[in-house]
């Protein structure tokens, strides 16, 4: 019996040893698997390269319609107009680390018009960038800085704005510093090859410095801007140049100022101030000194994400008298200093009323009495995908006028946007201008007393192809 018990104990010990041995084997095996598995996964991730190249093709189709009456210095038979306009953009993008290439072709035409009203390369540029924030860009670029008051795309004008340029800069750690260099030439001009009067923008040369800083842990952004713009002076036809009194030449004007954006919760305060100096030129006229300025302030209050309110004031300096052509003109007062501020290349319809009676559509004889714009409005999203806005403008000249009141009129704007999907949006709007006798005298058109304008825009912008490798 003892022998049998001893035998059973030996067998039990052997079984326990085997179990212990097997347990150790399984422990070692699982440890190895757990150790190898992540390593294998990491090795696999290392072997599969992250896509370095990306190509995107997209289409931007704009169908735009307008019906207007009044607002422009035209005869009674041209006082009303209705038309439909189409704009097609084909957009191509290529990206890889350190390089981006962007091209946009644009076709613009009025429906029913034979041929194309405009077909051009709206944008075409290449941008080289480094990991430390420095970059260089060359080509035709649609520029947009700050609130677009001085430099913007002005996209509502359908043809929009772009510039042929070289841009270098730095972006990082809250700092943005850009330097822009432009030089335009007209290859059809074989006489001295200096005059430039057609192209992306109407200037000979432009140099721009822009700096922006976002304060850390504080809702404040500050920008500084300096521009030096060379405009061609003299007659367009070189054969008519008078080298003794009015030769072809380039005159320069400067723009400098700043923009501030303070945006705590539920409130955004914006302010800007700019000055213009240098020389103002016009065809067949001597250059005049420029002493102009503008200032603006705007508050946007958003109690919730669903609605908000705006209130603000713009002041653009103006001339006291009409300009006089070179050589003088009997009965007109000669003045050598231009005080009328020019917004240059900004998105003008964004600030002084979407119809923009004052800068897109100039006064008679180019007279610029300046502008005061007091505005108040509201915006909101009453239902999903629908945005609505209402804005009132009180408009007046900046300078006092002889025998006329400064008040130009009152403008009411109503707008709505409906987003059918992420790439389909319908916008509609209506503007009513209640002009005064001052507006009529400056525009020389009685129809400005009751200018009205309704419009719609349908934008379809799908991405048709996208790939990475």
List each language-model region with its residue ranges.
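Extracellular/periplasmic loop regions
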Residues: 276-377, 441
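Outer membrane beta-barrel
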Residues: 82-188, 208, 212-216, 221, ...
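Bacterial Sec-dependent N-terminal signal peptides
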Residues: 1-44
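Flexible, solvent-exposed coil segments and beta strand-coil junctions
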Residues: 68-71, 105, 142-149, 180-192, ...
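Beta-barrel outer-membrane channel/assembly domains of diderm bacteria
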Residues: 43-139, 166-170, 251, 260-272, ...
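Short Gly/Pro-enriched turn/cap motifs at secondary-structure boundaries
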Residues: 80-81, 156-158, 199-201, 248-249, ...
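Outer-membrane beta-barrel translocator domains and adjoining extracellular loop/strand segments
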Residues: 69-76, 113-119, 148-155, 189-198, ...
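Internal metal/ion-chelating core segments
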Residues: 176-272
């Amino acid at each position: 019996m003892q022998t049998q018990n001893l035998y059973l104990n030996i067998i039990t010990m052997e079984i326990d040893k085997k179990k212990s041995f097997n347990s150790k084997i399984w422990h070692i095996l699982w440890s190895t698997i757990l150790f190898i598995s992540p390593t294998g996964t990491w090795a696999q991730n290392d072997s599969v390269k992250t896509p370095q190249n990306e190509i995107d093709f997209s289409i931007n189709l704009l169908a735009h319609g307008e019906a207007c009456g009044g607002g422009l210095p035209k005869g009674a038979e041209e006082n009303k107009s209705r038309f439909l306009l189409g704009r097609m953009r084909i957009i191509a993008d290529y990206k890889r680390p350190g390089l981006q290439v962007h091209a946009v072709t644009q076709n613009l035409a009025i429906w029913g018009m034979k041929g194309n009203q405009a077909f051009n390369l709206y944008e075409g540029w290449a941008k080289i960038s480094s990991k430390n924030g420095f970059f260089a860009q060359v080509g035709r670029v649609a520029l947009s800085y700050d609130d677009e008051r001085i430099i913007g795309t002005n996209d509502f004008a359908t043809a929009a704005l772009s510039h042929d340029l070289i841009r270098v800069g730095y972006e990082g750690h809250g700092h943005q510093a850009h330097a822009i260099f432009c030089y335009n030439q007209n290859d059809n001009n074989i006489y001295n090859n200096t005059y430039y009067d057609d192209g992306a923008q109407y200037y000979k040369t432009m140099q721009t410095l822009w700096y922006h800083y976002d304060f850390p842990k504080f809702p404040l952004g500050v920008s500084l801007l300096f521009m030096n713009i060379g405009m061609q002076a003299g007659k367009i036809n070189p054969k008519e140049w008078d080298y003794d009194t009015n030769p072809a030449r380039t005159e320069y004007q400067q723009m400098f100022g700043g923009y501030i954006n303070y945006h705590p919760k539920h409130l955004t305060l914006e302010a800007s101030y700019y000055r213009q100096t240098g020389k103002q030129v016009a065809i067949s006229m001597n250059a005049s000194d420029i002493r102009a300025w503008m200032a603006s302030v705007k508050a946007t209050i958003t109690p919730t994400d669903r609605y908000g309110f705006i209130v603000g004031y713009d002041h653009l300096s103006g001339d006291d008298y009409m300009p006089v052509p070179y050589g003088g003109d009997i009965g007109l007062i000669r003045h050598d200093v231009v005080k009328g501020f020019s917004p240059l290349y900004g998105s003008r319809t964004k600030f002084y009323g979407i119809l923009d009676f004052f800068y897109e559509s100039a006064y008679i004889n180019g007279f610029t009495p300046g502008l005061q714009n007091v505005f108040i409005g509201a915006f909101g999203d009453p239902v999903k995908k629908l945005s609505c806005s209402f804005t009132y403008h009180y408009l007046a000249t900046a300078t006092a006028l002889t025998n006329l009141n400064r008040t130009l009129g009152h403008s009411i704007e109503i707008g709505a946007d409906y987003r059918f999907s992420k790439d389909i949006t319908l916008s509609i709007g209506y503007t009513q201008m209640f002009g005064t006798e001052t507006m009529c005298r400056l525009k020389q058109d009685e129809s400005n007393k009751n200018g009205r304008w309704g419009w719609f825009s349908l934008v379809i912008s799908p991405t048709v192809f996208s790939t990475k490798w």
